[in-house]
A protein has these predicted regions:
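Small-residue-enriched transmembrane helix starts and helix-helix packing motifs
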Residues: 1-20, 83-93
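Alpha-helical transmembrane segments of multi-pass membrane proteins, especially transporters
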Residues: 31, 51-59, 79, 83-91, ...
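Interfacial loop-to-transmembrane junctions
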Residues: 129-153
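Helix-adjacent hinge/juxtasegments
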Residues: 61-99
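Interfacial segments of multi-pass membrane proteins
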Residues: 30-47, 94-98, 102, 113-122
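Juxtamembrane boundary at the C-terminal end of a transmembrane helix
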Residues: 160-173
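C-terminal ends of transmembrane helices
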Residues: 13-22, 64-75, 123-128
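Transmembrane alpha-helix interface/packing and boundary motifs in multi-pass membrane proteins
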Residues: 13-31, 93-104
Length: 173
């Protein structure tokens, strides 16, 4: 009975983690912490050094990918750090609004639309040229999309490894 509860909990977290990641919530962190919790809860059954190392590496790469693509992808367009932060805040704010209006897909589209709108508004106010503003806005939307896809891929990999660790493990007995 205990194994059934543990497996059910792991399956629930493995499904919830990537969904939370889509909403810009800490789904990948939840997946990693759940895996570590299982490993230290019953180390005979669930502790696997290679698997946990792979999960930590995938988690770090997913966070690094989102940070670098989201921020430095826009920064290479030679905008100020204020613009980068303004675009990130616009993206996050409209992600939340998009999630409220149209769950799941709305968060992804909201993040891209928020980055687009914030970049367009910044560049239009800064330079006053709508063509340059449109170009920066499209770049911001694309960078936000690529950042989210990379982090979601890491979340799906973490979910698969959590299922491998808890549901599809080999009995050592």
């Amino acid at each position: 009975m205990e194994l059934l509860v543990e497996r059910t909990f792991a399956i629930f977290i493995a499904i919830s983690g990537p969904i939370l990641t889509i909403f810009d919530l800490p789904g990948n962190t939840l997946l990693l912490l759940t895996s570590l919790m299982f490993a230290f809860f019953d180390e005979v059954l669930y502790f696997n050094g290679r698997l946990l190392s792979a999960m930590v590496l995938i988690y770090a790469l997913g966070e690094f990918w989102e940070f670098c693509v989201g921020l430095f992808g826009i920064k290479r367009r030679k905008v100020s750090w204020f613009a980068v932060i303004f675009i990130a805040l616009g993206s996050f704010t409209v992600t939340l609004l998009g999630t409220l209006i149209f769950p799941i897909l709305g968060s992804l589209l909201g993040g891209m639309a928020g980055a687009f709108a914030a970049a367009f508004a910044y560049e239009l106010a800064h330079a006053g040229v709508s063509a340059a503003a449109m170009q920066l806005a499209w770049t911001a939307a694309k960078m936000r999309f690529f950042a989210m896809v990379g982090k979601l891929a890491a979340g799906i990999a973490l979910a698969a490894l959590l299922l491998k660790q808890v549901v599809f493990f080999k009995y050592i007995i």
